[in-house]
Amino acid sequence: VTAVRLVSTIDVPLDPGSADAPALLHRAGRRLLVQRGDAELVALDPDSGDTVRFPAPWPRGFGTVAVSPDGGTAVFAGVHAVRCVDTSGAVLWEARHGCWAGECPVVHGAFAEYADDEEHGYADSGSAAFSADGKLVWAHVRGPLAGDGDAAADEEPDELWLVLDAADGRVMGRAGTGTVASGSFHTPHPDPAQMGLSIGEGEEGSPALWGRWDGRSLSVRTIGEETVLLDVSPSGRRLLTTDVQQDALYLRAVEDGARLRDLDAEGAVAGLPGGGRVYWDFEAAFADEHTIVAGTSGSDRGHGPARHWLVDTAGMTLRGGITYPHPVAGPVRAAGDGAWYTVSEDRRSVHVWAPADGS
């Protein structure tokens, strides 16, 4: 059993009843608490207390968001476009693409065209993320792009992974993903030229992709067909994944995606009362190059407090359970600098944790 210390508690900026759960981003030694409401996206610097508010171009149910490492710009990955805005809400650039709603064939010009349409209210979605240095935006969209011409519009739409210039939205690289997504998310890498992408296809599968941008072209490799990316180690050399059934944690080499070691939840983690199935959460974190923090909060639900565990990467062995000063809820998420965070059950605060001195 490992004791941990509470590094900080951060109050969320928006009412949880009308906003998404908060996320704590970490880039280059800086943390940024981000929370999306219907009318705005808020980015809070926990160290300085400075808050930046980005007016939202559409309600929060229509797509996903990303914030630049310096907190100065935000990207909204919507149903019809990837839009970059500054803190005034002014559009810096926009990349319009095929509509994510069902079989809709339209490359829309504005959100108002479908704002009141029920089918568009339940559209699938892509995602976007800034590179580590903030100079690139990686985006998963549905094709065709607005500038692809009539020939592309007549073809069966393909989903695309784009590398965009964060300054002006220029498409620098693109690759077809061959997927039919219901949603996706990105996993950043310390190297701005690399990025991970997990794509959920509902019952069709869950491919995980790894992209590399060499300044001229985007190359994409499939990590696994039933795989979810969880985190990248601080050195950038190791990748943590799980399978869609959440049976095991897999340590992989970023260079080629090769599986190095794994750890099954069953047999490693103490069982549940009544013999229920134990499985890993869809979120976990590298505390450092040699230590993973992972949880079984999903399978623990209904049986007691969420349980979190330390895993030694050298052999992918369970080092032990974590003892917190008070019960925690939900999974663990990476907070950088050897720390991780949890969100309180009422979603009103974020707790940042680190191993106690000597642990």
Positions of PLM-derived features:
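Repeated scaffold domains used in trafficking and secretory/extracellular systems
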Residues: P13-A28, P55-G71, C99-S131, G176-P190, ...
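Surface-exposed loop/turn elements that mediate protein-protein interactions on large endomembrane-trafficking
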Residues: V1-S18, R36-P59, V82-G121, A151-G178, ...
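C-terminal appended segment following the main domain
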Residues: R277-F282, A287-A329, R333-A334
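Short beta-strand elements that form the blades of beta-propeller/WD-repeat-like
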Residues: P22-A43, V67, G71-C84, K135-D154, ...
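A contiguous, surface-oriented mixed alpha/beta subdomain in the mid-to-C-terminal portion of proteins
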Residues: G215, S233-D243, G257, R261
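Conserved long hydrophobic alpha-helices within structured protein cores
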Residues: C84-G98, S125-H140, V254-L263, W280-T291
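Fungal eukaryote-biased detector of long internal structured cores
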Residues: V75, A115, H120-W138, L145-A146, ...
